A protein has these predicted regions:
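Transmembrane-helix motifs of polytopic, lipid-linked glycan transferases
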Residues: 49-58, 152-176, 214
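Short periplasmic/luminal acceptor-recognition loop of GT-C membrane glycosyltransferases, typified by
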Residues: 484-489, 503-556, 578
């Protein structure tokens, strides 16, 4: 038995990757056995813990002291990052998750799986419940099944976020970027709005960036470390990245480029480890979900008819539309006096083409950046722009600030750019800036290796001030975040009223913060008229409703989707005596009326509610029907 080297601590990143891989693997296995329940979860993670104890001497080792030394530094950059991290942690502890995608389908699918004690293809018009990647959900499932609460889910993102600074430094420096410059970016980049706003959220975009960075980190270590574990960990990390979100699949390309560049090192001791990891990597990647999508829909995406409208019909329109959305989210200040719709400013021919080929196009900018649409932010974009300008200027002037270009790093960065363009030419979503969260680190690194500068660049006052401003600009966003406000919202509303702030501004403020305050259980009042003993409740929805709140209190009832095409006998046969009906679903999706539905089902309306799920949509009418 080999002893751990003196002074070395556990490689916590490796443990996180192993834990994530085990969670995905055990989720699928327990589902197949029908044991996705407390007993199965306890047995599974007992095996994982036992394996860690038995093989503790062989676990990857790293230096855990360097990070603490950096945080104890008197320099401002680590302190600002630490401040933002603490603020994010407070928000995560204080509030229930309110991410809308999480409430509409990500947590909802976990609720279905836990009720059925395994993964299942859910009969629903919210198809995202079925075809989306499952990586984040397999981390949520054991927490929910054991503790029957969603208040711990923020820890998934928070733990992952803690690894980001060290990974940025490792990947950047291995790409040939000077260590001084890498040191600054390791603090600046994690303060990007898309990362810090999701650090205590239940969103599943930014945490995939950590898996991607980890996959490169362990590949780069193949040459400097004799450990055969690095190739295996890299393989697992890249698989986890794809399992989290299918939109991350193009990022496999730069990983393969690094594999090619490291082929001689991998051909030795690392090859058996990587080959051994491949079966597990396949199981925890997006591939199982792709195969299930093919089985149930005939298409690996799960959306053969593009019902979600997320596949653009023209690659050029995709690149242009996504670029405009990136500009809208990242070239404006984090705080704006009022919302602005930039669509009318487009030339008429371009506007017509984008609305035809890129239906989800959204050029509305709100008063502040929120996690649903945030990218890295204006400060980081300006800082990257400064490196481009200074790099060109230094090269033209023949300045000594110019560093030598690293050609292999250029190949990796070029592959990252190609991956981003592939995404932008194929995918059309209104949330481009958020969905590209895993792409930004390599794109920023691409700027730094294309326009290489000597480490003395960080001593320039302009760089330091711009870096500090970029980091500090995230502080008000974390404090003002509507999903997790760290200030007394009601007190501020009263002060605004007494200070004669225009009524429209106060009304907008009140609506946004009140909607977010209720979002985690926004539909719960629909359950109030239903007797407590009802174990199954019908649900007729639009496909984008916050279903998770209907399951409260968790474990007491199952929500089953119905449609107007179902007969009364079909509905009753499923044990349903009450149905919750969205008027918007009847009007816009099924093109029918509540009167028709009541007549068909011989039902009566026992309650009618007006509920605001999203601040920009306003109140929606809901009915509680008794059969």
């Amino acid at each position: 038995m080999t002893c751990a080297r003196k002074g070395a601590s556990l490689d916590w990143l490796a443990l996180w990757i192993l834990f994530s891989a085990w969670s995905s693997l055990s989720g699928w296995c327990l589902s197949g056995l029908g044991y996705l329940n407390p007993a199965g979860i306890i047995f599974s993670y007992s095996l994982f813990l036992a394996a860690l104890i038995v093989f503790r001497s062989r676990l990857p080792r790293g230096s855990g002291r360097a990070g603490w030394r950096m945080l104890r530094s008197r320099r401002m950059a680590p302190r600002i990052w630490l401040l933002l991290t603490v603020l994010a942690l407070i928000g995560g502890i204080a509030y229930s998750p309110a991410n809308y995608d999480y409430l509409t389908y990500r947590f909802s699918r976990v609720l279905y799986w836990s009720w059925d004690q395994g993964w299942s293809w859910i009969p629903t018009i919210n198809h995202r419940m079925n075809y989306s990647g499952t990586g984040f959900e397999w981390l949520m499932a054991p927490l929910f099944i054991l503790f029957k609460t969603d208040r711990l889910f923020f820890l998934i993102n928070f733990i992952s976020y803690l690894f980001m600074p060290g990974l940025v430094f490792s990947v950047f420096s291995h790409l040939g970027i000077g260590k001084r410059i890498s040191w600054w970016w390791m603090w600046i980049l994690p303060c990007g709005y898309c990362y810090i706003l999701q650090a205590a959220s239940a969103g599943n975009d930014s945490f995939a960036a950590v898996y991607f960075l980890a996959s490169l980190h362990y590949l780069f270590r193949v040459k400097t470390s004799s450990s055969v574990k690095n190739p295996a960990l890299s393989c697992l990390a890249i698989a986890l990245m794809t399992g989290a979100k299918a939109s991350n699949l193009p990022l496999v390309l730069p990983w393969l480029v690094v594999v090619f560049l490291k082929r001689r090192n991998l051909w030795g001791k690392g090859a058996p480890a990587m080959i051994a990891a491949i079966p597990v990597a396949v199981a925890i990647s997006f591939l199982p979900m792709a195969l299930l999508n093919i089985h149930y829909t005939g298409d690996y995406t799960g959306d053969p008819h593009n019902a979600s409208r997320m596949r653009v019909s023209d690659p050029l329109s995709g690149v242009v539309g996504n670029s405009l959305q990136l500009a809208k989210d990242n070239l404006l200040p984090p705080l704006m006096p009022r919302p602005i719709d930039w669509t009318p400013f487009l030339p008429a021919p371009l506007k017509a083409r984008l609305l035809r080929d890129f239906p989800p196009l959204n050029l509305n900018s709100g008063e502040l950046q929120i996690e649903e649409h945030a990218g890295p932010g204006l400060g980081i974009v300006l800082l990257a722009g400064l490196f481009i300008v200074m790099g060109i200027r230094a090269r033209v002037a023949g300045s000594s600030l110019v560093a030598v270009r690293n050609n292999p790093a250029l190949a990796v960065a070029g592959a990252g750019l190609v991956a981003g363009l592939v995404y932008m030419s194929k995918m059309g979503s209104e949330a481009t800036s958020r969905l590209l969260a895993a792409y930004y680190p390599l794109l920023i690194a691409g700027v730094l290796v294309t326009f290489p500068l000597d480490g003395r660049m960080v001593h320039r006052r302009l760089f330091r001030w711009l870096g500090m401003i970029a980091m500090l600009s995230a502080v008000p966003l974390v404090i003002l975040c509507p999903a997790r406000p760290l200030f007394p919202t009601q007190v501020v509303s009263s002060l605004m009223t007494t200070s004669h702030v225009p009524d429209a501004i106060v009304a907008r403020y009140d609506r946004v913060y009140s909607v977010y305050a209720k979002r985690s259980d926004v539909l719960r009042e629909l359950i109030a008229p239903i007797p407590a003993g009802e174990r199954v409740v019908g649900f007729l929805q639009t496909g984008n409703d916050a279903e998770a709140s209907l399951w409260l209190p968790f474990g007491t009832r199952k929500i089953v989707e119905v449609t107007p095409e179902d007969s009364r006998e079909d509905v009753k046969a499923r044990g349903i005596r009450f149905v919750l009906v969205s008027q918007n679903a009847l009007t816009y999706h099924y093109h029918t009326t509540i009167s028709f539905l009541l007549a068909k089902w011989s039902g009566t309306v026992v309650a009618e509610k007006s509920i605001i799920e999203m601040a920009n949509l306003g109140p929606e009418t809901w009915y509680v029907i008794s059969l």
